[in-house]
Regions:
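Extreme N-terminal starter segment of soluble prokaryotic enzymes
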Residues: 1-4
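Flexible beta->alpha loop and helix N-cap segments adjacent to enzyme active/binding sites
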Residues: 9-36, 76-91, 97-100, 104-213, ...
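Active-site pocket-shaping loop/turn-to-helix segments
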Residues: 30-41, 236, 240
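Phosphate/pyrophosphate-binding loops at sites that engage ATP/ADP/AMP, CoA/4′-phosphopantetheine
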Residues: 47-61, 249-254
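Conserved beta-ketoacyl condensing-enzyme motif
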Residues: 57-80, 84
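Glycine-rich phosphate-binding loops at beta-strand->alpha-helix junctions
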Residues: 60, 70-72, 255-272
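Short glycine/proline- and acidic residue-enriched helix-loop micro-motifs
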Residues: 221-237
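Phosphate/ATP-binding catalytic cores across multiple sugar-kinase/actin-like superfamilies
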Residues: 236-256
């Protein structure tokens, strides 16, 4: 049976395909069409996911569509999909139901509490669920405008960043702030998770929803720019309050599953991991709206068709990959000089040598990642042993603020030597802590409070990248590499070889490995 899921159709469109219970493909549309936050049906992703799954449109038995979706009337959307998938049933999936299914059925748990929190997916901004076997039942709901996601976005805008796009910057800034504004935000967010409209109202048009009373308590004149010195403390007050509030919403249970855009906040995830209330915490790593495409197919397979579970998500490498002939054709078409490395050992040896020479490498291997994070298949790599590596990554390639630190990839069997991490570090969906004896080595990557974006790489998850890390460790004594997504500022993650070539020659990357092909400047 082939099920096709469509989610994020208001602006983070994505497609996923489940075939006979196995997740075969998942792709965000913007990684293929390079349009910022594409809405509507993700036609390119649909075609590519079906190709990767080895399925035709006539073989699709169900199209699972996650609400809400653009301004197209539901009847018209059904008509469009019936034209494209003539033999398929059209199933509608509620937004938070899709988030919940994506979290629970991707997890390894047979029973769990599930918490989904976002901006306002379907007028609900949050739901707590109880999940067991193949069923997920809602226990409690929160409705807009009492939205923690909306509040986080409003503070993001207040601090001079883009709501809906740069909340992660507020998260990172918060790591260096004090808690002087935490009491104020605890008044904004009541103990029942309702937002006090005398401080903040999502329906208020002026000042991003904040009231004169809020600015008076903040000690800043309404309508003026927030002083730079106050920004970290405001960010910290918000982050601390959100963490405490979410802890109160999450309820009890042995296992906790998380999804929804708020849980792209890795510091929040780490707080829940470390609080000690649950034995295990799992966050669906593509927690935002694109990830509802996963939830759509899981919902139909498990909750509608009542099919047994198969052990959760096994991989996020669900996008397209490219063979040697496809890569070579692009390189020759671009009239580039390149070297073909005949063995994997030779390729790894060359990469380790260059990293030891403090060069910055682009690394494009295998199938593209689904979700917002690079996990070693579409990555830019540098050695922590180069004291200027993070500075060079920023100056010559990423052009981003110094407070945005780079991830550190480490083999799973050696991770405990360098970092304290939880299981969600497998997908870069949490943060870790640097061991005291290694603070100096990773000083440039520490966010504050010894936090670091640790990426734990198991051999079974990514054998080639794992080998690279191990070989780098043997050569230098440090099996850790800084890892950031292979894309330029403002662009999505590279998908195809031509994307990689464009990014390579538009940046200060020193060398690029695309499959077994090596390009140097």
């Amino acid at each position: 049976m082939v099920i096709l899921g469509l989610g994020g159709l208001l602006g983070d469109a994505a497609c996923a395909v489940l075939k006979d219970g196995e997740l075969k493909a998942a792709i965000e549309e913007n990684k293929l069409d390079h349009v910022w936050r594409p809405g509507g049906l993700p036609q390119a992703s649909i075609a590519e996911c079906l190709r990767l799954a080895g399925a035709t449109r006539d073989e699709v038995e169900c199209v699972a569509l996650v609400r809400p979706f653009a301004r197209t009337p539901e009847s018209q959307m059904h008509s469009i999909l019936r034209d494209q998938f003539p033999k398929a049933e059209i199933a509608m999936v509620e937004h938070h139901q899709a988030h919940a299914a994506s979290a629970f059925f991707a997890s390894p748990f047979e029973e769990a509490t599930v918490l989904t929190l976002d901006h306002d997916g379907d007028f609900r901004c949050g739901t707590r669920w109880h999940a067991k076997d193949t069923q997920i039942q809602a226990e409690r709901e929160w409705y807009y405008p009492d939205s923690l996601g909306r509040l986080y976005g409003a503070v993001t805008q207040l601090l001079g960043y883009r709501a809906g796009a740069e909340e992660h910057k507020v998260q990172w800034i918060s790591a260096s702030g004090d808690e002087r504004y935490a009491p104020l935000f605890r008044e904004v967010v009541t103990t029942s998770a309702r937002l006090d409209p005398s401080f903040f109202d999502g329906h208020r048009q002026s000042e991003g929803g904040f009231s004169p009373k809020f600015f008076e308590r903040l000690g800043i004149e309404e309508g003026t720019r927030i002083p730079a010195a106050a920004v970290p403390a405001i960010a910290r007050g918000l982050q601390k309050t959100v963490e405490e509030t979410v802890l109160g919403l999450a309820g009890e249970g042995e296992n906790l599953c998380l999804a929804g855009g708020l849980f792209l906040n890795v510091m929040l995830v780490e707080f829940l991991e470390r609080c000690g209330r649950w034995k295990k915490v799992f966050v669906q790593p593509a927690a935002g709206n694109a990830g509802t495409a996963l939830g759509a197919v899981y919902h139909v397979w498990h909750q509608v068709r009542r099919q047994k579970r198969r052990g959760g998500m096994q991989s996020l490498f669900l996008g397209p990959g490219y063979g040697a002939e496809e890569i070579k054709q692009v390189l020759e078409n671009c009239k580039l000089r390149f070297q073909y490395l005949r063995s994997t050992d030779d390729m790894l040896a060359q990469a380790v040598r260059m990293l030891g020479e403090h060069k910055i490498l682009a690394w494009m291997q295998g199938r593209m990642e689904f979700g917002p994070r690079a996990l070693g298949n579409r990555s830019i790599l540098a050695s922590p042993l180069d004291p200027y590596s993070t500075e060079n990554l920023n100056v010559f390639i990423k052009h981003r603020e110094p407070f945005r630190k780079f991830a550190a990839s480490v083999p799973a069997e050696e991770a405990a030597e360098y970092f304290e991490t939880g299981p969600n570090a497998r997908y870069l969906a949490t943060v870790g802590r640097v061991r005291p004896q290694h603070r100096k080595t990773f000083e440039a990557a520490i966010l504050g409070q010894d936090m670091i974006r640790a990426h734990v790489v198991a051999e079974k998850d990514n054998p080639l990248y794992h080998r690279l890390l191990r070989k780098a460790g043997k050569a230098t004594g440090l099996p850790v590499l800084y890892n950031t997504s292979f894309n330029l500022f403002g662009d999505p993650l590279v998908s195809a070889p031509r994307d990689a070539v464009r990014s390579f020659y538009s940046s200060g990357i020193d060398a690029m490995f695309v499959g077994n092909f090596l390009l140097e400047k």
